[in-house]
């Protein structure tokens, strides 16, 4: 059996008939984005004095998230950045930290009242390193949020979903996927490609039941590719000293060898 099938029972798992959950999401801070009443505007910044290597990842994120803009951190505090962002009508901030010239942390906050999520970042593959990668265009992508099955997972997934338009432009055939598996969130960006299935030499052309030529669907990865793991979720914006934590990962409480317990 896989670890997914041996997963410990969790009382916070979502149920299809849970009216309380559906009532909550209709009134939460992300609801206006899902009702297309509000569009995200995202700022990306870094730690002070970032290395040049993190800028390749930033460029990829600018193509992944619509209406996303990079601002140099300089010497500003996070509190000053939040105040500036609110004045400029930003709805989200992404802050990237790094170690040994590799991005290793990502903080995502929703303005003006949170929540704020802190992720460990691993396995970054920039677009330029993906064989046969495509280039994203200006069409608004679809967003797929997969396997966020607990109340915490729903909250994390809705935070990601609020960063995208919910009126995707299907003509662009672009899809941003956030797939949760065992509390690791795999982020991918693809384009669908449709091709008529050609007949082999001396063979009859393949047709569907409607008499039309069969069409094959393939995907082209646009990049970037990376993995996130949630470290904590806070109710407000950037206050690790006095802020209220909705959830925090504590290794000694969860158990180092507890491989069957997942939280998203």
Could you say what each language-model-derived stretch is?
Residues 1-264:
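Phospho-regulatory, Ser/Thr- and acidic-rich intrinsically disordered linkers and terminal tails
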